[in-house]
């Protein structure tokens, strides 16, 4: 069985929920404290043992490439000024993994974005990490899925429970047999109408997929939102080869919408030893 060494991070979306901030800045570069959101995703992949990452980008996304590239002039300035701690942080972001880029020329959905990276992946199993979900866990969320793949040899989709009132916002599974946190799946449903979801186990932006998924993506018809949905292709593949769902451990932060982004920023700031006390004092004086 081939080890998983490659990952895809889709980052071609327009970020309309954050306009006008994202008119010229990629949504993925919006910072949680002092790091852009996409760096948290790359760090998770790197900690899981991923060596090669392809980021699927679009127009006006060059800042992502610049962030993970060397910037010798900046490094020289920091070194000359004796700012070793900042120098280490800057160099760290460039050494996380081998990072490559491909453009999604049309906005045709997540499934289309994944298919755009087919040549990079080749005939290997691979991971997918979506940038809207930051997960804090002792074992990286994607590594938990990779471990299930190594046990079973089958594709694995990361899920977590959500309130029933929110199921229409996600892809949702209809689980059958369960072993620990691993589920066999009868059906994958993309954004079910409110009140019709088969469970409250929602797909949460982490996948380990076998290369056969590309065969299904190539012939996948448009689905929800008139886009090529990855969930629909996974559902078709599941009818031919078992696809598992895994309820991974960890705290998930939704940074794909404004309220979740603000909540994440506050929670991370409250954990930061340099600012937590001052922030707590500030919040207290707001008298809310």
From Swiss-Prot:
Catalytic activity, as annotated: alpha-D-glucose 1-phosphate + UTP + H(+) = UDP-alpha-D-glucose + diphosphate
GO molecular function: UTP:glucose-1-phosphate uridylyltransferase activity
Coiled coil: none
Family, per entry: Belongs to the UDPGP type 2 family.
Pathway info: Glycolipid metabolism; diglucosyl-diacylglycerol biosynthesis
Function: Catalyzes the formation of UDP-glucose from glucose-1-phosphate and UTP. This is an intermediate step in the biosynthesis of diglucosyl-diacylglycerol (Glc2-DAG), i.e. a glycolipid found in the membrane, which is also used as a membrane anchor for lipoteichoic acid (LTA).
Protein name: UTP--glucose-1-phosphate uridylyltransferase
Keyword tRNA-binding: no
Enzyme Commission number(s) from the entry: 2.7.7.9
GO biological process: one example: enterobacterial common antigen biosynthetic process
Pfam families: NTP_transferase
Domain of life of the organism encoding this protein: Bacteria
Top-rank EC class of the record's enzyme: transferase
Lineage, uppermost ranks: Bacteria, Bacillati, Bacillota, Bacilli, Bacillales
Keywords annotated in UniProt: Carbohydrate metabolism, Nucleotidyltransferase, Transferase
